[in-house]
Amino acid sequence: MFIKDAYNMRALCTALEQSAPDTIINTSKEENNSYYCATAHLLRTDVCSLVNRVGIEPLKSGSILSTLEELWQAVGIIYRLYEWQHVSDIDTNFKKLPNNSDFGLVFSVLDCDIGYVITGKKDSKGNIELYDPKNSLLIENDDIKKYLYDENFHRFCIMLIISKSELEELSRESCDQKCIMG
């Protein structure tokens, strides 16, 4: 299990746009301005600036974001190396994950400033379980879409799935690229 904290995704994207415009590769904004997506390569100084602006606390119990270096890697992975996807693709993406694996899922609900990072497991039979670190709820297969998608309010999630092995691999790649770029 990894990345157990929630943080303000919209503020992070806004700060990213303001603090490091030269590093932005691609940004997009929905017509209703409800959310931002950004893809960028972040340097260490950019992360320091983002931490100061957004108020992310890198030292939190139970989190891998225990140092600024790890925060840089996590933010870099989320915003530089992955694309956001609509929650309707959730089944397809879960099927791609290998059985007996841990993974993380990042989502942000429209009209809600907070983006959450939750963890999950895929067992040997392919069943999915999600764990919400905020209230320690266990969300099982039948309730996952209900948890992530509210038809009554026409809200949906922007999501990112990271397998644990991918996270470790991309952390190394991110660190290597950062070191190369100085």
From Swiss-Prot:
<keyword id="KW-0964">Secreted</keyword>
<keyword id="KW-0843">Virulence</keyword>
<keyword id="KW-0732">Signal</keyword>
<keyword id="KW-0614">Plasmid</keyword>
<comment type="function">
    <text>May function as a virulence determinant.</text>
</comment>
<protein>
    <recommendedName>
        <fullName>Protein YopQ</fullName>
    </recommendedName>
</protein>
<dbReference type="GO" id="GO:0005576">
    <property type="term" value="C:extracellular region"/>
</dbReference>
<feature type="signal peptide">
    <location>
        <begin position="1"/>
        <end position="24"/>
    </location>
</feature>
<dbReference type="InterPro" id="IPR016505">
    <property type="entry name" value="YopQ"/>
</dbReference>
